[in-house]
Amino acid sequence: MINKLKNPFDPSFGALPQIILPNYQSDFESPTSVAQAIAYDDPNRVIVITGLRGSGKTALLTQIEQQVVKLPNTYVVEIDNNQRMVQNFGHNLKNIFKMHTLTDKIASISVMGFGLSFNKTNEDYTTQDIENFMTMLRKLNKRVVIFIDKFNHKENTREFIQLLQNLKRHNLNFYLVADGLPKMIYDIEHDQTLTFPEMSI
């Protein structure tokens, strides 16, 4: 009988995990290559980092963000999935327009059919407001990269992913880079009502 060596880096001391997920990072050699894929408008809109606790997921997410923030015409948005994610996203988009003086450029672009709301509080932003912001960013040839640390499967997460499904359906320019434990990512990917993560990962 062959005595197999146990992996010293596995806190379960060699026990097989209940869930085995494919390596979604396998196409990328480094954080820089992830940023390059985004810069070249890679059609894969979701990049997921998964692994055991303490495996360096957050550190890798941070390294990717540091590379992405250097890209031209790209805005980074950090979303806390313990808060109201849709409203938080809307507030971040409003700040992009204000901080980067994009409001000065809006006048020269047709906005027939919708308006942009800059005076709302976090709680007041709707999915329509967000679609309007994102539509304007597309007209300005800008992209948004959303970063979420410790992604999990909760009601506010479901609401946020449903919003992303709508944004993708309207061909709006965004990417999602997230990290999470294997069980959490599995639950999100296999939620029957959320087709966007499964199609994108």
Residue ranges of each PLM-predicted region?
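A short, basic N-terminal segment
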Residues: 1-44
